[in-house]
Amino acid sequence: MEKLTDLNYTLSVITLMNDTLHTIMEDPGMAYFPYIASVLTVLFTLHKASIPTMKIALRTSRCSYKVIKYCIVSIFNTLLKLAGYKEQITTKDEIEKQMDRVVKEMRRQLEMIDKLTTREIEQVELLKRIHDMLIIKPVDKIDMSQEFNQRQFKTLNEWAEGENPYEPKEVTASL
């Protein structure tokens, strides 16, 4: 177990692996060899570094499950970034946080819609009352007999007060 955390041992294994790959593939025209070697080196280093890191994390922390989960997610996200992917793995806690945020936003929007609907209903009721007040009465219900020009039909004696209301009056003002 001590060899797993020994840096010299890890570096010697990486050097041995690189030397082995160089001897196997001695073709100078091999264009992808540096990329393959670097990927294998990164994978080996991650493998060798992750085990001691998790052991140290488990010893020092009380919440072992969350630490292991975080380490694994971080390792996979690093591998995805090395592979060129922009997506990331998210933990269940992050998904629950995002779901809570979405649900909270939906509740806020529903409350706003409810307020707007209530205001619209109040406005419709107000418009209905205004319309009821402005409705024009039908002609057959209005007594139009007093609206005709009665000056031609009645004489001075027939007027109620003895004067024709349509005649202009003389107005005198005191000076």
Swiss-Prot record:
Residue sites binding Ca(2+) per the record: 120, 123
Topological relation to the membrane, as annotated: Single-pass type III membrane protein
Pfam families tied to this protein: Rota_NSP4
Keyword Transport: yes
Keyword presence, Membrane: yes
Post-translational modifications reported in the UniProt record: The N-glycosyl content is primarily Man(9)GlcNAc, with a small amount of Man(8)GlcNAc.
Annotated localization: Host rough endoplasmic reticulum membrane; Host membrane, Host caveola; Secreted
Cytoplasmic side: 52-175
Example GO biological process: symbiont-mediated activation of host autophagy
Sugar attachment sites: 8, 18
Domain notes: Binds 1 calcium ion per tetramer.
Family statement drawn from the similarity comment of this UniProt entry: Belongs to the rotavirus NSP4 family.
Name of the protein: Non-structural glycoprotein 4
